[in-house]
Amino acid sequence: MNRPSLKHFYIKSFGCQMNSYDGERMSELLESQGMKAAEEAATADLVVLNTCHIREKAAEKVYSEIGRLRRPDGSSPMIALAGCVAQAEGAEVLARTKMVDIVVGPQAYHHLPELIEKAASGKVVDIDMPLESKFDALPERRQVGASAFLTVQEGCDKFCTYCVVPYTRGAEVSRPWSRIVKEAHALVDKGAREITLLGQNVNAWTGEDEAGRSQGLDGLIRALAKIDGLERIRYTTSHPNDMTEGLIEAHGEIDKLMPFLHLPVQSGSNRILKAMNRAHTAESYLTLMNRLKEVRPDIALSGDFIVGFPGESEEDFQATLDLISEVGYSLAFSFAYSPRPGTPAADMDNQIDPEISRERLQRLQALLNQQQFDFNQQTIGRKATVLIERKGKKADQMIGKSPWLQSVIIEAPVAIGDLVEVTLTDAGPNSVKGQFLDQKQFATA
């Protein structure tokens, strides 16, 4: 990179875990070009805003962030707008703000070094979508934590009427088996004890193994489970229609596959699910949930919910509350419907009054919060293996993850990357506390 004035970069990622993964890869890419990460945007020569376009509020937040990058003397760093806002708005970004120098989509960020060079002569836009060449061009992972993300699939073919993902991430594409397995080995060699497989519809992954046999995500997970040193496997985000019997059975057969599943449903009303083009019913979703509980009785379940979708009645909303009550979630995410330009739902009649949506969101979130607290309380007394991931606020405090994705607070002389056996002793709304069983059971990576 022949730009000595650009020595330090800062990346801020918004939104989903896929964006977090992309942010990590962009950081590694820029470091491979000789740049160093800055602690804050104020000291960076290049700022990359890795954006989310799922909701209007998330997209607008980015433009506010751009404005804050102007420095007291009137100058600003080189600014690259990456991610899904960049993909959705393209050159319109440059018309909306003069501060952005580079617009780069989520399938083109491997071109970032070249785009930085071009930006010296003028503003540039790259929103091409050649998915696999992106992974080919990225450098090897350098540093990873105890838990690492690994993208195996991108894009979406479902075209839910409220969602921009098919337009910003493109069609469903699965990375080849061999490259996934190779990257997983590399992550473990660098210290990862847990890998989370990522995809917009991760359970839609398909490919051929080394013997040329067709495989689904369950086959890939079975292969990864054989890697020595890899202790835990997770995957997210899934679609109910791609939840195969083989994948369900994997939850009961593979010890390394953690007893946690995030499976969005969005609504408990069949009428609203049809309007959303979800292509499943509340009943079929509940059947999946019950089957998962059969094969893995201790599984913790998570979901996503949208309230205030166009035409949603109080009866429709009550159906969602009823579904939540029947499933019993350990964790879930709820959102008020946000019209996204270019999606069919944005042009539907019977848009819901925002005040009604907010009131429903409060009621729904109260139920979800109670369920999360109840789940945490139900785990008190359980023995659990906890993966230590970071330091806590106190000097002797460490925080790790339980198999059920709970944050576990531990006070003991352990290190990041340790897998420790504890008894869960106390529960709060968002975390639990753990007591060591025996220090001899510590296992340091």
From Swiss-Prot:
It is found in: Cytoplasm. Monomer. NCBIfam families: miaB-methiolase, MiaB/RimO family radical SAM methylthiotransferase. Its main location: cytoplasm. The gene is miaB. Residues 142-374 form the Radical SAM core domain. [4Fe-4S] cluster 1 binds at residues 16, 52, 84. This is tRNA-2-methylthio-N(6)-dimethylallyladenosine synthase. Residues 7-121 form the MTTase N-terminal domain. Catalyzes the methylthiolation of N6-(dimethylallyl)adenosine (i(6)A), leading to the formation of 2-methylthio-N6-(dimethylallyl)adenosine (ms(2)i(6)A) at position 37 in tRNAs that read codons beginning with uridine. Its EC number is 2.8.4.3. InterPro entries: Elp3/MiaA/NifB-like_rSAM, Methylthiotransferase, Methylthiotransferase_CS, Methylthiotransferase_N, Methylthiotransferase_N_sf, MiaB_methiolase, rSAM, rSAM_horseshoe. SMART domains: Elp3 (SM00729). CDD domains: Radical_SAM. It comes from Zymomonas mobilis subsp. mobilis (strain ATCC 31821 / ZM4 / CP4). [4Fe-4S] cluster 2 binds at residues 156, 160, 163. Its cofactor is [4Fe-4S] cluster. One of its GO terms (molecular function) is N6-isopentenyladenosine methylthiotransferase activity. Belongs to the methylthiotransferase family. MiaB subfamily. Residues 377-438 form the TRAM domain. Binds 2 [4Fe-4S] clusters. One cluster is coordinated with 3 cysteines and an exchangeable S-adenosyl-L-methionine. It catalyses: N(6)-dimethylallyladenosine(37) in tRNA + (sulfur carrier)-SH + AH2 + 2 S-adenosyl-L-methionine = 2-methylsulfanyl-N(6)-dimethylallyladenosine(37) in tRNA + (sulfur carrier)-H + 5'-deoxyadenosine + L-methionine + A + S-adenosyl-L-homocysteine + 2 H(+). PANTHER family: CDK5 REGULATORY SUBUNIT-ASSOCIATED PROTEIN 1, MITOCHONDRIAL TRNA METHYLTHIOTRANSFERASE CDK5RAP1. It is an enzyme of class 2 (transferase).
